[in-house]
């Protein structure tokens, strides 16, 4: 197992201006906030929380570069390169590897109903081209792709496929994976189910709300690992109250607005996402003040 990659990661948010361009200084500040203020172990860059599937190849490269330069070489870095265009994914993977990212990750190909053999070859092609370590990004609610225990085994047979970012509510499958593949990394991808994932034996977690609520997430992770389940649940309950309100107000716009309370130029969501609704400002003020966000 890649012990050095265990831990808690921010699924990095990306600030955009009104024209959909990346705000470089804002991105640096968001990256530094995750490590220095939220005390996380690393960054997961260009995933769903970075609105990755709304941006072009050059913007993805720009984000990889800025994020890496912002936090330096001592921070764990995972580059999400998944794309429906295999050539783009390879190009991004080579670029992130050259920048010194510790591992790559790639969402399962979506939209087209591919066979498992086609999906497996997609990952093998990425590894062959980049020669970097790979973490499968499984998020079936958004991709429609469900991989079973035996199919994960076929993927994990490749020595460079070191684990999975598991963003699914199926804890039976998670338990089966943990039992079957004890030497592979499993990262939880659902912030609101962190305690259940830790009890199931995950090695770390990657989350969007960790950008603003990372310290509570670490409390949950460490308390649950220590067997202090009741205490961990108290923090998870509080965290889920926060998450429920953020989801009600709009996930990405609200996370970015919370960062603005910290003086970070966190910009706008990328269209077609709508900006934060100012009619919800009083509710957000209350949330930030109540939970010291």
Curated annotation (Swiss-Prot):
It catalyses: aceneuramate = aldehydo-N-acetyl-D-mannosamine + pyruvate. It is found in: Cytoplasm. It holds the Pfam family DHDPS. Pathway: Amino-sugar metabolism; N-acetylneuraminate degradation; D-fructose 6-phosphate from N-acetylneuraminate: step 1/5. Aceneuramate binds at residues 48-49, 167, 189, 191-192, 208. The keyword Cytoplasm applies. The keyword Metal-binding does not apply. One of its GO terms (cellular component) is cytosol. Its EC number is 4.1.3.3. GO terms for molecular function: N-acetylneuraminate lyase activity. It is an enzyme of class 4 (lyase). The active site is at 137 (proton donor), 165 (schiff-base intermediate with substrate). GO terms for biological process: carbohydrate metabolic process; N-acetylneuraminate catabolic process. Coiled coil: none annotated. Its main location: cytoplasm. Keywords: Carbohydrate metabolism, Cytoplasm, Lyase, Schiff base. Belongs to the DapA family. NanA subfamily. Homotetramer. PANTHER family: N-ACETYLNEURAMINATE LYASE (PTHR42849:SF1). Catalyzes the reversible aldol cleavage of N-acetylneuraminic acid (sialic acid; Neu5Ac) to form pyruvate and N-acetylmannosamine (ManNAc) via a Schiff base intermediate. This is N-acetylneuraminate lyase. It comes from Staphylococcus carnosus (strain TM300).
């Amino acid at each position: 197992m890649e012990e050095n990659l265990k831990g808690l990661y921010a699924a990095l948010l990306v600030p955009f201006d009104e024209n959909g361009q990346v705000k470089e200084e804002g991105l640096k500040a968001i990256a530094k906030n995750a490590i220095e203020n939220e005390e996380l172990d690393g960054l997961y860059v260009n995933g769903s929380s970075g609105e990755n599937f709304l941006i072009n190849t050059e913007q993805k490269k720009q984000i990889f570069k800025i994020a890496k330069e912002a936090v330096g070489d001592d921070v764990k870095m995972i580059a999400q390169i998944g794309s429906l265009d295999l050539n783009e994914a390879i190009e991004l993977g080579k670029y992130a590897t050259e920048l010194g990212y510790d591992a790559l990750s790639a969402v399962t190909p979506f939209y087209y109903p591919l066979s498992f053999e086609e999906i497996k070859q997609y990952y093998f092609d990425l590894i062959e081209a980049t020669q970097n370590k790979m973490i499968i990004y499984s998020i079936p609610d958004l991709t429609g792709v469900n991989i079973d225990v035996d199919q994960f085994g076929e993927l994990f047979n490749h020595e460079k496929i070191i684990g999975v970012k598991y963003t699914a509510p199926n804890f039976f499958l998670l338990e089966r994976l943990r039992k079957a593949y004890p030497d592979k990394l499993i990262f939880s991808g659902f912030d609101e189910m962190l305690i259940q994932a830790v009890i199931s034996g995950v090695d770390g977690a990657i989350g969007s709300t960790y950008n603003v609520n990372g310290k509570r997430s670490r409390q949950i992770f460490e308390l649950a690992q220590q067997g202090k389940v009741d205490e961990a649940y108290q923090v998870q309950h509080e965290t889920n109250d926060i998450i429920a309100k953020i989801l009600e107000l709009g996930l990405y716009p609200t996370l970015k607005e919370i960062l603005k309370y910290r003086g970070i130029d966190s910009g706008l969501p990328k269209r077609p996402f709508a900006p934060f609704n100012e009619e919800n400002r009083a509710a957000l003020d209350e949330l930030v003040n109540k939970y010291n966000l």
